[in-house]
């Protein structure tokens, strides 16, 4: 077993960067090989390493094990049971320039070979101790399932992905801060986790923290209650990468914004990377200090749009593949054509279809199965776009009352949404200008025409407004 594992690590050293070998492969410890089941048991020092190695390196290790044992082998990764630890120490580092162990076609150890003797407790402790990369994962709160490899790219998000890759490769230099904005379920959270995972996987021992804005607020409150602001500042200022999700939740929380401003200034001054997500463009954030908004604008701001048809199909096919379910393209196209708003909705629809198929014993996914499983969703998405639907959708988006669409009030926070709704009513329905005016509280057709022209002109000049209109159009089209 020892000879096999040394050879396995040596072969992997020829395929993987040194940082990945140090961070992920060397801490692994082979436990035993079950000849009856053809299962190789391998221990990882902690849950984070186990999940990462299983997802990223299991196929390579299984291929090398199959070559050595001359049969297909399944690798079972596990944690040391009961604290007893593995029975063999991790493979020591090969000295620079030392030749890799050579074997005749990776010939297997004879079945009757004596078992390895137990190692000293010190070796066991060393084998299970998490190295720097493992500690980073434990503290980072990163989701290891969200990587660049499984992020589906299309026109809607290709610029955001390119910027994210650049930041992952050159943190603190290229775009700092990186500000990603877009509607719910479009992949913002996936992308920032992918950046963090890529930096940790590089094995450089970076200090990373993913935190939702609500959790950051909670951290500030706890620091205030415990009179521990020095510790709070010391921790956040020491990070190499800070990922803040949904920063719009900082709205109205002045102490939180103040502490974040100090952390922002300290990190940027040291060329430490900050990445922020929001549901809206920085200048449209309500209740956020102007100092912070100016800092957000100082880096790169990128929008993530709702996915186009081809991208929605690709997302469905990728998700079905990850579930181990073959999906014909015609089925993916059927779902994608009827559900257009965001990735989360697509994945939810797919889960509903799969659950329906399993419950009813349908082995093959078909368009008919989708129609049956999604009939409630399809009845909504197939409905005609009406002025009433537009008014409700726009009111929900801008967080105003539908009644404000008909009222005579004209404050800016109501006038703009009302004009947007009039513009969309003209673009997306067959109603005439007088008919639209009647549905907006009996307004004259010239008022509607003025709103349509104003929004049309502004859309061509303002990227934020264009993005907002695109999101609303995609939502209304279903």
From Swiss-Prot:
SMART domains: AAA (SM00382), Bac_DnaA_C (SM00760). It is found in: Cytoplasm. The gene is dnaA. Residues 141-357 are annotated as: Domain III, AAA+ region. Residues 358-478 are annotated as: Domain IV, binds dsDNA. This is Chromosomal replication initiator protein DnaA. Residues 1-71 are annotated as: Domain I, interacts with DnaA modulators. Signal peptide: none annotated. It comes from Bordetella petrii (strain ATCC BAA-461 / DSM 12804 / CCUG 43448). Keywords: ATP-binding, Cytoplasm, DNA replication, DNA-binding, Lipid-binding, Nucleotide-binding.
